[in-house]
């Protein structure tokens, strides 16, 4: 069973082709016809499986940062740089005023998932560890893993530069061997990059870089807006380092769900019209940044972000 947006409602939209409607229309569909399901957190969800992909243009420095509510951009950037650094310590984010991992890194939560021997904040071999040290033996968040495991992120960058038509430009956070060691298995778990080569009649133009990300568990209220912005930013970062043009970010979802206690706040969000997406500029040049590890929070300059106000939703851990 599917629910469609009627023509009358579409005609009332001032900008019916705005890419944010992909997100809003999926939320409406889930609320209307989704399957009511129990879940790990005890909150309960309304869910659909494998909805159509979202596609967001990254051309002309566009950043698909949702506008029908304010997205915590500073938190998105800090978390992304935390991933890139390979860090697995939630306290490193907390010290920057970003508490999005505090619930999963609390002593109470770690004990609940059988990891009570870890110190508070030690999340185990989560995203950043897999990106930079896949296959290395994890000890704790304070270990020195330099040169250990597979640096997938650097391999992605090297392959884009040296073999751009490769069909194996993959970044995976899903490592079955390490799942029992993680405070929370990865939700956004896998992505593939694709380089479109310059056309024959324009050999001097830059190749175009796109990213497809698969997300197994998709919290539409809180997580997905964050994840869209994060992987769009990652694509922009890699494009700068590899001298390619950011082109498109595609999100394919598995279990796409709305938590039961998010339904009413999201109905408020559905009443809002999307505004123009902002633009991303770099405060420093490619030469000044140097490599993927050279980015700083201050390098991300987002211009023209004029969202609607914040909508509070509780996180289920």
From Swiss-Prot:
PROSITE patterns: THYMIDYLATE_SYNTHASE. Pfam families: Thymidylat_synt. Gene3D superfamilies: Thymidylate synthase/dCMP hydroxymethylase domain. DUMP binds at residues 40, 167-168, 216-219, 227, 257-259. (6R)-5,10-methylene-5,6,7,8-tetrahydrofolate binds at residue 219. Keywords: Methyltransferase, Nucleotide biosynthesis, Transferase. Pathway: Pyrimidine metabolism; dTTP biosynthesis. It comes from the Eukaryota. GO terms for molecular function: thymidylate synthase activity. GO terms for cellular component: cytosol; mitochondrion. One of its GO terms (biological process) is dTTP biosynthetic process. Signal peptide: none annotated. The active site is at residue 187. Its EC number is 2.1.1.45. The keyword Methyltransferase applies. It catalyses: dUMP + (6R)-5,10-methylene-5,6,7,8-tetrahydrofolate = 7,8-dihydrofolate + dTMP. Homodimer. Belongs to the thymidylate synthase family. This is Thymidylate synthase. It comes from Cryptococcus neoformans var. neoformans serotype D (strain JEC21 / ATCC MYA-565) (Filobasidiella neoformans). The gene is TMP1.
